[in-house]
Amino acid sequence: MRTVQVPRTKTGGRPTQQEAADRLQRLLDVARRQFLSAGYRETSMESLAREAGVAKKTLYSRFGSKAGLFATILDALRRKWVEELRGLVVESDRPETVLETVALHLLEVGTRPDMIELYRLLLLDAHRVPGLIRGYYDQQGGLSGMEPLADYLRAAVDAGELALDDVPVATEQFVYLVLGGIRTRMLLGAARRPNAAARARLARQAVRIFLAGCAR
């Protein structure tokens, strides 16, 4: 296993805010790679510390436990996703345009090989490790990074553009309509990642079905 040294500051003093952020990101990259490669239960703090080139006590001091480190990785992914999604949602656009943009992004990100491996890890280990992701989902109110979409749908309902009785449920249904089928087949090894043209077709069809049930 190769070791990824986390660089120290040149001055020997406290790291700058940017240096600290860079070091944390490198550490999280190492941890994410090991979790995806070996699985949650088989990954140890010892192996993570060794590959990252840091002391094990540093990991425990920063994250508290392996579960805390994994939760930090999930939260970092969620924050990045939410930031990307917020940049895509333009409330002045028509619902069809906004939803197709979101659907395409869901398919582009959600069918990436590394994301499929993450889903597989969660499916395999979540029931073996109680609380592995339950607290994360509870903290996010069940939306798990889809808050910008929920906010948009709620605004569209208020504007009289869509008719939805339960926005959080509709948000979840939209995600599964877009991503659920192909992701399940990929997880089972029954399908390869669709190419860009196929992803665009899936996005358009999912949006048409969704709007057929809620457009005014």
Language-model segments: what does each one mean?
Residues A163, V167-T171:
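Membrane-interface starts of transmembrane alpha-helices
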Residues Y40, F63, L123-V129, Q139-G142:
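Short helix-capping/turn signature of helix-turn-helix
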Residues M1-R14, T101, H105, E147, ...:
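C-terminal peripheral helix-coil segments that are non-catalytic and often amphipathic
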Residues T97, E117, L121, G131-D158, ...:
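Amphipathic alpha-helical packing segments from all-alpha helical-bundle domains
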Residues A71-V102, G110, D114, R154-A155:
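Amphipathic alpha-helical linker/stalk segments
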Residues M1-A38, E42-V54, S61-R62, A67-G68, ...:
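Basic, helix-initiating cap at the start of DNA-binding domains
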Residues G110-Y137, I182-L188:
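Amphipathic alpha-helical segments used for helix-helix packing
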